[in-house]
Amino acid sequence: MIALILFPLILLTVLVSLLYWKQDQVVKELLQTLNDDFAGHFEIKESHISPFENFPYISIDIEDMVLYENESKEGVHILDVHDTYIGFNIWDILYGDMEIKSILLNDGSINLVQHKDGSFNITDALATKVEIEDPTKEFHLNLKSINLADIDINKLNESNGMYFDLFINEAKSNFKTVADDVQMFLDSKFIVTYIDNGDTTFIHDKHLDVHTEIDYIAKKDILKIVPSEIALEGSVFNMEGNIDFADDMFLDINFKGEKPNFDLLIAFAPEEIAPTLKAYNNRGNVFFNGSILGKSINGHTPNIDAVFGCTEAFIENTSNDKKL
């Protein structure tokens, strides 16, 4: 009985010791490979073993990972993450196989900039200096999951001042490979803000929950979003569509929503007036149809269309019993 209890503890100790012994070599090789292969410049502060943070994987915690657009390190960083956990399978470690199975980014920021010529700072940074025949072998990757926690992603378009801010409270994704195609299952909670050339829009501090499956079709270089659910400020929408990477990231995404009250409209209302709208009793057949269609990179901006409708509606002011 005592042996059965002690065996898992002894095994875990052995595995952590093996990873501790190899961590410096793993991190050094990874950092050198990244800087040798890509135009951008990566830096880290230090690393240590974290057995349980990314369980069931045993992880190396890379502290304060930073990515700059180029080796001169001019301008704002692209990536600055306090903790980057790279996870390894327990049994793989025993056999000396150090493939990275999981990545967890915790507490940081990603700053994306679309330059006036249409290029992105991140694509410039990840432009390869040498030909990479197989990225999975080059970086010892066999990813099964990528997770984010408390990551602030923002995107600025220098030509028109459009600015998006996406604060990810939590995002969990799992991968399954079928031939050359990849299925990804995503659950996430985040807050989104959109600023148009310095002016705040109605999309400000909106809370979204996304539950979706995304399929990447390798031969066509297309990302397919299967029918999924999005919750915006508590109102549920359906979403589906495609992203064609080969055609300047052509977006063809559709949204639909229906409610027996005005919750759909309130979900899109500016933050300062939403509490006032919620104070009224309301009812009606409210629907929303939205779409994003068109190329989205290299100087292109997709068309965004939204249509609201309502039938058999009424609004009641509970303070004076007046109805509209």
Spans of features found by a protein language model:
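N-terminal type II signal-anchor transmembrane helix
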Residues: 1-39
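Short extracytoplasmic
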Residues: 36-60
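Beta-propeller and related beta-repeat scaffolds in trafficking/envelope systems
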Residues: 76-79, 181-183, 187-221, 266-285, ...
